[in-house]
Every structure is written in C-alpha cells, then in structure tokens.
C-alpha cells in the first residue's frame, strides 16, 4: 500500500509540476514543434511561432565566438523552427548548411540535459567542443559541466537520445524533477564541487 501511495504521489507531483511549468500553451507549442528538431528552446514572437533561442544569431557563435542578437530583418525557417541573424551574410551561411549551426540538445542548458532535464539556457553562456555549440543556463551551470566535459557529454548524449529527443520538453522536465537520475546533484552540491575544484587549482 505504501509503495502504491508513493507512486501515486509522484505521479500527482508530475501533473502539478507540468501545470506549474507550462507558462501558457504558447510556450509549450513553441518548444515542441512537429519537427525532427523537437524539442527546441524556442519562444513564440509574433508571426514566428518557434523562434530558436529568442532570436540569438547562431552563426555568430561560430564566426565571432560570442552571443549576438539576431534581427527580424534577417530570418530563416528550417525544420519548422524559426531563426534570426544579425546580417545577411550570417543568414546565407546558415541557409547553406543549417545543421552545422544547430546548438546541441535543442539549445537547452547542456548541463540540465546531463540530468535529463531540458532547462532554459542563457544565450551568452556557452562553449564550443569539437566544433559543436553548447549553451548553458548560466555561468554556474557551465562551470559544473566543465568539471568533467567528456563524462558529462556522455551522460547528456545518453539522456538526450533515450529520453528527451522527440518528446515533449515540459513533460520530460516535470518527470525528471520528480524521478531524478541516479547521479543527480542539487544546485548547491554542484556549486560546492565547482568551488572545491577552483580551490584546488590555486
């Protein structure tokens, strides 16, 4: 009876979290287009129903190694997802090879995907690994990820492939906030690990 009650409580928790994190149907639809790229870290902005990374110019990460906000003047649509660019030149580069410029894990925080959780990301916190773009939810998330880049990439790829890719980002996030992965660490634990690593380098 106790086991069934705990399971029911967790399932109820998922439902509550899902409702709490939806932030409106438009957000859910924006992140979950009918697309091979689903889910993506996108928002709805006017006529652009699935605007990747709030319009960040993805090409600039590769060509300038920095975050640059795109303009509605230069935009493309690829696999039912909308993209903006800071210049016609960047748009042309993207249109020639759009897959090359896609952020890994749909533009969600790469460190969140390590735990099977598609969290939002901060456009100006990123790194490039082997020519691929990884965006993070903030400097703390990036620092935690970089404690073990090979190991965290392996975990992130595992959870992205087996759980996140092709599925609804809101339900996945809610599920993994209740049913945590075996290696789960809280934000406080990760911050402590980062602080310890920095102290050891001094």
Question: What are these model-derived regions, one by one?
Answer:
Residues 2-13:
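Bacterial N-terminal signal peptides that target proteins for export
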């Amino acid at each position: 009876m106790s086991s069934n009650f705990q399971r029911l409580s967790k399932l109820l928790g998922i439902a509550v979290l899902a409702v709490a994190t939806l932030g409106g149907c438009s957000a859910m639809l924006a992140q979950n287009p009918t697309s091979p790229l689903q889910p993506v870290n996108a928002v709805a902005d006017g006529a652009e129903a699935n605007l990747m990374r709030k319009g960040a110019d993805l090409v600039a990460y590769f060509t300038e190694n920095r975050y640059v906000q795109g303009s509605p003047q230069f935009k493309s649509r690829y696999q039912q997802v909308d993209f903006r660019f800071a210049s016609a030149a960047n748009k042309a580069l993207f249109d020639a090879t759009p897959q090359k410029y896609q952020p890994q894990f749909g533009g969600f925080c790469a460190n969140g995907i390590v735990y099977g959780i598609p969290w939002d990301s901060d456009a100006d916190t990123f790194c490039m690994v082997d020519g691929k773009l990884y965006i993070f939810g903030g400097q703390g998330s990036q620092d935690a990820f970089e404690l073990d880049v090979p190991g965290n990439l392996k975990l992130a790829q595992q959870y992205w492939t087996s759980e996140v890719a092709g599925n609804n980002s809101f339900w996945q996030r809610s599920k993994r906030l209740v049913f945590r992965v075996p290696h789960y660490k809280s934000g406080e634990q990760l911050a402590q690990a980062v602080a310890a690593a920095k102290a050891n380098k001094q």
